[in-house]
Amino acid sequence: MIYGIGTDIVAVARLRGMWERHGDRVLDKLLTPQEIADFSKAADKGRFLAKRFAAKEAFSKALGTGVRPPATLPAIAVTHDDLGKPILECYGQLAEVLKNKNLRAHLSISDEAEYAVAYVILEHA
C-alpha cells in the first residue's frame, strides 16, 4: 500500500552555482560522508548535486514532512545497486521512523540538459 508520493525538479545551474559560491562547506549541509566521497569523483559536480538534492526533496515530500528533522538532507543518502538502480538509504532517527512505520522507498532519478528530476514512492513494506 502506498504511504506517500513525492517529486522534485531542480535546475542544475542552481546547485552548480551554490557549490561555486560556497565551496565544499555546502557539501556537509547536502550530502552524507559517502556522497561527499562520490562527489569528489563526479565529472559534473553541478549535475551530481542537483540529482541528489531532487531525490532528497522528493523523499521528504513522500514522507509528508518536508526537509526538517528527522528528514534532514545529511540523513538521506542516494546510492546505487550493482546494476545502477538508485537507492535511498536513511540514517539515524529517520531510519528509525521508516522502520517503525514499516516503510520502503522507491526512487527514480532523471536529468536532461538543464534539469534533474526525482520521483519517490514510499510504501508499507
From Swiss-Prot:
<dbReference type="InterPro" id="IPR008278">
    <property type="entry name" value="4-PPantetheinyl_Trfase_dom"/>
</dbReference>
<keyword id="KW-0275">Fatty acid biosynthesis</keyword>
<feature type="binding site">
    <location>
        <position position="8"/>
    </location>
    <ligand>
        <name>Mg(2+)</name>
    </ligand>
</feature>
<comment type="function">
    <text>Transfers the 4'-phosphopantetheine moiety from coenzyme A to a Ser of acyl-carrier-protein.</text>
</comment>
<dbReference type="GO" id="GO:0005737">
    <property type="term" value="C:cytoplasm"/>
</dbReference>
<dbReference type="InterPro" id="IPR037143">
    <property type="entry name" value="4-PPantetheinyl_Trfase_dom_sf"/>
</dbReference>
<keyword id="KW-0276">Fatty acid metabolism</keyword>
<dbReference type="InterPro" id="IPR002582">
    <property type="entry name" value="ACPS"/>
</dbReference>
<keyword id="KW-0460">Magnesium</keyword>
<keyword id="KW-0443">Lipid metabolism</keyword>
<protein>
    <recommendedName>
        <fullName>Holo-[acyl-carrier-protein] synthase</fullName>
        <ecNumber>2.7.8.7</ecNumber>
    </recommendedName>
</protein>
<keyword id="KW-0808">Transferase</keyword>
<keyword id="KW-0444">Lipid biosynthesis</keyword>
<comment type="similarity">
    <text>Belongs to the P-Pant transferase superfamily. AcpS family.</text>
</comment>
<dbReference type="GO" id="GO:0006633">
    <property type="term" value="P:fatty acid biosynthetic process"/>
</dbReference>
<dbReference type="InterPro" id="IPR004568">
    <property type="entry name" value="Ppantetheine-prot_Trfase_dom"/>
</dbReference>
<keyword id="KW-0479">Metal-binding</keyword>
<dbReference type="GO" id="GO:0000287">
    <property type="term" value="F:magnesium ion binding"/>
</dbReference>
<dbReference type="GO" id="GO:0008897">
    <property type="term" value="F:holo-[acyl-carrier-protein] synthase activity"/>
</dbReference>
<feature type="binding site">
    <location>
        <position position="57"/>
    </location>
    <ligand>
        <name>Mg(2+)</name>
    </ligand>
</feature>
<keyword id="KW-0963">Cytoplasm</keyword>
<dbReference type="Pfam" id="PF01648">
    <property type="entry name" value="ACPS"/>
</dbReference>
